[in-house]
Design a protein with these regions (language model features):
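Phosphate-group recognition and catalysis centered on beta-loop-alpha active-site segments
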Residues: 1-229
Length: 229
């Protein structure tokens, strides 16, 4: 059975503030095969790496709760989460270079085009995915050579159809809704299954036994140790 990729969920978020440069650097140190991150588009078009639509830890009360798309890159760089600034996608790409794969989740409206512009020249070291399958379809049109994936937190009757609809490669499946039939169905169309977010030894062993292609986890060291890597 092939060894699954170990993908650091928002970086090594079990040890460092999520989606921070420190978390991504730590993921490299721990031997992750890839990092997963989230992007939103700032008001000036910059892609900011952050999970929620509106960042917390604002330096000024007037900025608290303001959505990323209403703030400039300069304003967003004044935010701190446990001492860590919000990085741009370019910051992360500069940090990791091509040492591992960058899996970019398209979160906010208008993120597909700028993400594709930054990632299209590194198809072996980057991919995009989203819960909004329309954005994945847009990425297919803009950067057909860039690997694509769809996120699912349910179990459709034909789980592989959403992947086929965007000519995608990776099905990001919430691990609680993952079984052998789903893995086999995706593999039958030459797709890949990435299980998320898998954080306990028993769950890591279970999804690995199903033959998943990637395990997205907050705990890279735990996953590697559990699998004997």
């Amino acid at each position: 059975m092939p060894t699954p990729e170990i993908i650091a969920h928002r970086g090594a978020s079990g040890e460092c503030p999520e989606n921070s440069l420190a978390a991504f650097a730590r993921a490299i140190d721990l031997g992750a095969d890839g990092i997963e991150l989230d992007v939103h588009r700032a008001s000036d078009g910059t892609l900011m790496v952050h999970h929620d639509p509106a960042p917390q830890h604002a330096p000024l009360a007037a900025l608290q709760g303001v959505p990323i798309h209403q703030l400039s890159q300069d304003a967003l760089r004044t935010f701190r989460a446990f001492g860590e600034p919000i990085p741009t996608l370019e910051d992360v790409l500069t940090l990791v270079s091509r040492q591992l794969v960058v899996y970019c989740e398209l979160k906010g409206v208008g993120t597909a085009a700028p993400a594709c512009a930054l990632l299209a020249d590194r198809p072996a070291h980057a991919a995009v995915h989203s819960f909004d399958h329309r954005m994945v379809a847009e990425a297919r049109r803009l950067a057909p050579n860039l690997p694509r994936g769809v996120l699912q937190s349910s179990y459709p009757i034909e789980p592989e159809r959403s992947l086929a609809s965007v000519d995608g490669r990776d099905l990001w499946q919430q691990h609680e809704y993952l079984d052998q039939a789903l893995v086999d169905a995706v593999h039958a169309r030459s797709g890949r299954v990435i299980a998320w977010t898998v954080n306990t030894p028993s769950d890591i062993l279970r999804v690995a036994a199903l033959g998943v292609d990637g395990i997205c986890t907050n705990h890279v060291a735990l996953a590697r140790t559990t699998l004997g890597l």
